[in-house]
A protein has these predicted regions:
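An aromatic- and histidine-rich active-site surface loop
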Residues: 94-107, 117-137
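Aromatic "clamp/platform" in nucleotide-sugar-dependent glycosyltransferases that forms part
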Residues: 279, 298
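Short hydrophobic beta-strand element within catalytic cores of glycosyltransferases
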Residues: 315-318, 328
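Conserved acidic donor-binding segment of nucleotide-sugar-dependent glycosyltransferases
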Residues: 330-331, 335-342, 351-356, 371
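Donor nucleotide-sugar binding/catalytic pocket of nucleotide-sugar-dependent glycosyltransferases
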Residues: 139, 148, 165-206
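Nucleotide-activated donor-binding/catalytic signature segment of Leloir-type glycosyltransferases, i.e.
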Residues: 262-278
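A conserved mid-protein helix/loop that constitutes part of the nucleotide-sugar donor-binding site
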Residues: 15-23, 215-240, 251, 256-262, ...
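Membrane-proximal helix-turn-helix segments that form the acceptor-binding/catalytic region
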Residues: 104-112, 158-176
């Protein structure tokens, strides 16, 4: 039995990262001692996790100490402008995100807890562990939850202009886990980091499956630019006078672009065909209202929403992103469309809407694919990694 610590920015938010960490922690704790460290504000955030945790898992809230007005200003300027990869800017960014007092507290916390292995969830916590790796006794790895572009795209990547910072910190770690082979190759070629691929598990098992007779396309995720929902409005508008004329579109989720999408719906006259739910907790119930899942994302690491769709037997229409390769084969579990070709996306939606038999066959294939992604099977791959690191 190993003592494992997991560092995550948020455990009590509603998102894919929180969901999959909860799922795997529930598996790890069957054989190990697991503590999850989360940065939620103790006074403002509740204690309820949307995704059930085993009572054996210890959850510890921690503060981001050592902060100051100047550090907050530097972070604000970075998020608004991106700053640059210059030496001075990198020095300022490290001090702004990882002040010395903060790093010292983490060194003491990990060493005092006698952890065998620490797992940093996503880039910000991977860098934290990298900066203190030389001063802790535990092995340390990162578990990255986005595509390479999602992190390092110069315009929209979360860690834009911090690639060198990430690289210097991450190369000190004992391991790195990514979600697909495309990310693995880019980490190797552009960062010089050898990464292990472990897929995310499906987030639930369901006896109830989607009804292929329903005439509804469904999608799920944050209503933000990278999800490409404007393409769905184009596609449903293109197809509304053909085989999709009786079909509706349900967007499960909310976000900063909800207002803009609603305005576009009105301009296109789609108010009766498209609805946006806002943030909901009963995602499974909402997904069952559809018979085809559509995903027009610009990038994905390993879309949990697709694993959920597969589990419910929903055929999938998606762009040809590398993240889709392990999940959906064109003509098997769904239709894969050349990236960002809105007209072909609309044609794929029309094709599935027009064939009950195609939807039924793809639904059966989707269920078989979901069975390969059970948490128990994914946990076996993690155990292999733990054994290699700790032997």
């Amino acid at each position: 039995m190993a003592k494992i610590g997991v560092v995550i920015s948020s455990l009590y938010a509603c998102g894919g990262e929180e969901r999959v960490v909860s799922l795997m922690a529930n598996e790890w704790v069957k054989q190990h001692e697991v503590t999850i460290f989360t940065f939620e504000d103790r006074e403002r955030e509740g204690n309820r996790n949307d995704y059930p945790l085993s009572g054996k898992i210890k959850v510890e809230r921690v503060f981001h100490s050592g902060d100051s007005f100047l550090r907050k200003v530097i972070r604000m300027v970075y998020f608004r402008t991106g700053l640059t990869e210059g030496t001075v800017c990198q020095y300022l960014l490290k001090k702004a995100f990882y002040p010395e007092k903060f790093l010292k507290e983490w060194i003491e916390r990990i060493n005092a807890g006698n952890y065998d292995l620490m797992i940093g969830i996503s880039g910000v916590n991977a860098m934290l562990l990298g900066y203190i790796k030389d001063h802790i006794h535990a092995k340390a790895i990162s578990w990255e939850h986005s595509s390479f572009e999602g992190y390092f795209d110069p315009q929209r990547g979360y860690y834009r202009n911090r690639m060198k910072m990430y690289q210097r910190a991450a190369e000190k770690l004992d391991g790195c886990v990514v979600l697909n082979q495309d990310i693995q190759g880019k980490y190797r070629d552009q960062l010089g980091i050898s990464a292990t691929v472990i897929y995310n598990p499906r987030s639930f098992a369901s006896e109830q499956k989607a009804d292929m007779a329903k005439k509804c396309f469904v999608t799920c995720g944050r209503v933000e630019a990278e999800k490409g929902y404007e393409d769905l409005l184009f596609a449903i508008n293109e197809a509304k006078d053909h085989s999709c004329q009786d079909w509706k579109l349900l967007i499960i989720g909310g976000g900063s672009l909800t207002g803009r999408l609603n305005e576009q719906m009105r301009e296109l006259g789609l108010e009766d065909k498209v609805s946006i739910t806002g943030y909901l907790h009963n995602v499974q119930e909402q997904l069952l209202k559809g018979s085809v899942f559509v995903l027009p994302s610009r990038w994905e690491g390993f879309p949990m929403s697709v694993t959920e769709a597969l589990e419910l037997g929903l055929p999938v229409v998606a762009y040809d992103l590398p993240a889709m390769l392990p999940l959906v084969r064109d003509g098997e579990e769904g239709r894969i469309v050349p990236c960002f070709d809105k007209r072909k996306f609309a044609m794929a939606m029309e094709e599935l809407a027009g064939s009950d038999e195609m939807r039924r066959q793809m639904s059966e294939a989707a269920i078989r694919k979901a069975n390969e992604l059970s948490p128990e099977k994914i946990a076996e791959q993690w155990e292999d990694l733990f054994s290699r690191l700790l032997r």
